[in-house]
Amino acid sequence: EGRTTLLGPDIEQATRAREQRLAAPRERLLQAVASGELLIRTRGSAVGQVNGLSVQPIGDQAFVQPARITATARLGEGQLIDIQRETALGGSIHSKGVLILSGYLASRYSARRPLSLAASLVLEQTYGRIEGDSASLAELCALISALSGVELRQGLAVTGSVDQHGAVQAIGAVNEKIEGFFDLCVGQGLSGEQGVVIPAGNASQLMLKEELIAAVESDRFSVHAVSHVDEALALLTGWPAGDPALGANAQTVNGRVMARLREFHELRREQAGARRWPAPGLAGAGETEP
């Protein structure tokens, strides 16, 4: 139009054009969730399960697909199994992110004794290669939920990477991720309990569509910026995160993790003691039962 300056209507028009290009894959996603083909929950709560947000390139556009991240935890010897890596579906940066989680768990919860834990992580219903560490905050929250037994809100999706001290780090495509989950929630019906947890470092980059802003202003959707995993846990659980340095405490998330790991440690000690001696009646020839 001969102008050299972009105005608000120009940006809105470009945004609508992008929305139209992504309409078909978005509609397929909504149908898959509605039919139960893709198991994504945006209501209720669950242990060891949280919604992450993955970005799929479509031409020059980024299409966001929610990814259900699940974790399990059991007695073990410090193993954290990255199922994406074990099946050659995880890239090196994603694998690095999972190794960072292992370091965080060991240093924060088990610095003075062996980590008596075996855990596994996977992005469910993903069949292509996963790269990047932007799911590591969600993965850590799922792991801590599995360990503590505290449920996570399924209406909150989580994006962000973490370092070995639990600090939440900025990620890419933050606007697309928020809007992608918002569109899914609109398709299922906004409940007022849905939203997205993002790194505080991304807050200055937000440029969201008007429909989403209106939903936030009317308390039908929310965007939460966090700087540490403990803040994300408090939002997802409704529990105080607590300080693991204070030991086992059934009233906080981290206190319950400490209690579970102490239980695992005692079980390992008992099993190690039982292996030291043969069971009664099973002494070998020339041996005397204790």
Regions found by a protein language model. Name each.
Residues G48-D60:
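Structured beta-strand/loop patches that form or line metal/cofactor-binding pockets in enzymes
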Residues A62-P66:
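Short, flexible loop/turn motifs enriched in small residues
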Residues G2-G36, Q194-A200:
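Conserved C-terminal helix/linker of AAA+ ATPases
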Residues L30, A34-T42, A46-N51, A67, ...:
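Peripheral, non-AAA+ core regions of ATP-driven protein-machinery
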